[in-house]
From Swiss-Prot:
It is found in: Mitochondrion. GO terms for cellular component: mitochondrial small ribosomal subunit. Keywords: Mitochondrion, Ribonucleoprotein, Ribosomal protein, Transit peptide. Residues 1-70 form a transit peptide. SMART domains: Ribosomal_S15 (SM01387). The gene is mrps15. Residues 238-251 have a biased composition (Basic and acidic residues). It comes from the Eukaryota. This is Small ribosomal subunit protein uS15m. Belongs to the universal ribosomal protein uS15 family.
Length: 263
């Protein structure tokens, strides 16, 4: 853009200089190029070449850019983990407490990656809701693991909102946790309340089924009701007919029994 403007201004200067140089060489006053006409010619040339692209000096200031929004800080679930804590695989090792300070520092969370910190957070959530020390497969433990993963997905998507693949995985994990919470609420309500309280989960009921009413649906519904009523009427008539036949059969059988006893 800058090179184009420079090129056009150079061409314009050369064209104007050529007009005046021809006038000097002829040493005659050109009636067609008076001072006013030359200025008008110059203005016309400027307006012709710079109508679409104004010069850099006279270009108007446009306030089209939107102000940059500051992202709100998303609280991380790993903030409460101290850097002096040992990793999960070394926390239960007695020898890790008596090693050299340099070696012990290498085993802490200060030199741990994100997955190791997330594993320790999962173990902390599991310890809050598990039924006993050896419980690793109950519904409460599964809900705790899924909760840690969901919060990790939320933190990641807050930094990278265009990551559609992880968003899909997060929604699938949320649906799986809803299914487990629904089962736990139906079978063990006391454990369900404990899990929601300890993990900070707000359980919301699924929305009621809603279908938009259309003319086609109304016509189909009216036809189905008409068919249902007709079928019920035919079944009622058939039942009445069967009752009448049964009563006639009983009446005929009762009338023949006294004759047999008299004989």
């Amino acid at each position: 853009m800058v090179l184009k403007s420079v090129f056009r201004s150079t061409v314009l200067g050369l064209r104007t200089w050529s007009v005046f140089s021809v006038a000097r060489q002829s040493k005659t006053t050109l009636p067609a190029f008076s001072q006013a006409q030359c200025s008008s010619y110059t203005n016309w040339t400027f307006s012709r070449h710079f109508k679409g692209d104004e010069t850099l000096l006279n270009q108007p200031v446009r306030q089209y850019a939107r102000p940059s929004r500051k992202k709100q800080e998303f609280p991380s679930q790993l903030e409460d983990l101290k850097t002096s804590m040992l990793k999960h695989e070394y926390a239960s090792v007695p020898l890790a407490q008596s090693v050299d300070d340099v070696v012990k520092k290498l085993l802490t969370l200060e030199f741990a990656n994100h997955s190791e910190k997330l594993r320790l957070k999962e173990e902390q959530l599991i310890a809050k809701v598990q039924r006993d020390e050896n419980d690793r497969s109950s519904t409460e433990v599964k809900v705790a693991i899924l909760t840690a993963r969901i919060r990790n997905f939320q933190e990641h998507l807050h930094k990278h909102p265009k990551d559609k693949a992880n968003k899909r995985w997060m929604l699938m994990t949320i649906d799986k946790r809803k299914k487990l919470l629904k089962f736990l609420r139906r079978t063990r309500y006391d454990s369900f309340e404990k899990v929601c309280k300890e993990l900070g989960i707000t359980y919301t009921f699924p929305p009621e089924y809603y279908r938009r009413v259309t003319r086609r649906w109304l016509a189909k519904k009216a036809f189905c009701n008409k068919v249902f009523k007709e079928v019920q009427r035919l079944k009622a008539a058939e039942r009445e007919k069967q009752k009448a036949e049964e009563a006639e059969r009983k009446k005929s059988s009762s009338s023949t029994n006294p004759q047999e006893t008299a004989a």
